[in-house]
Amino acid sequence: EPVIVNIRSRDVIHSFWIPALNGKKDAVPGRTHQLTIQADEPGIYRGQCTEYCGLSHSRMQMRVVALERAEYDAWVENELQDAEAPLDPEAAAGLELFQGQCVTCHQINGVDEVEFAAQVSGAAPNLTHLMTRSTYAGGIFDLYEQANDGDPDYDLGGIPYNDLPEEGTFDRNQLEAWLRDPPAEKPMAPNPTQYSQYGRGMPNLNLSEQQIDQLVAYLETLK
């Protein structure tokens, strides 16, 4: 089915392009551009930003997931649900850590009325259903090992997209490396317009190994 995409930018000019689905469309700060895309077959279609936009431009990849209508409706129904409070003690400790360290930029639906409410709305991805995705960190890292298996169309190793949280092989090592030192994995962009020692991107929070284990245990519950 045809899908209309609203394309915006928060910072500089980007260009949205999924070659198999349509032509390019610029993302310009302060404007909304529309682009109609349509996939003829279910699958995962790769794209790339085609406008030089900064230090990580070459790594600004995109993936569009096309599903059958019934699978899409099931995905939407799940995405509209709030995150559930974890029962596992380690995951519960991870939620407490998330509330103290991560909600400045990230949000999780159902965890937005806590004492440490998000201070920068929309500054970073909403993580309510993190584990239903195939990538993170702007599409740079694969959440599951199957994400690069198979042919160039990304068949996810034969696993249906909606089944990744239950059947996929979670790449825990890469997520731990990301939480341990994000700027070492993906350089931060300078942002001299804000009164902060940090640039744009995820800073190093200097988490201990125990804290990383707790945070990963919590993030794994976000399905």
Name every feature range the model reports, one short phrase each.
Residues 7-10, 88, 92, 96, ...:
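Soluble non-cytosolic domains of exported or imported proteins
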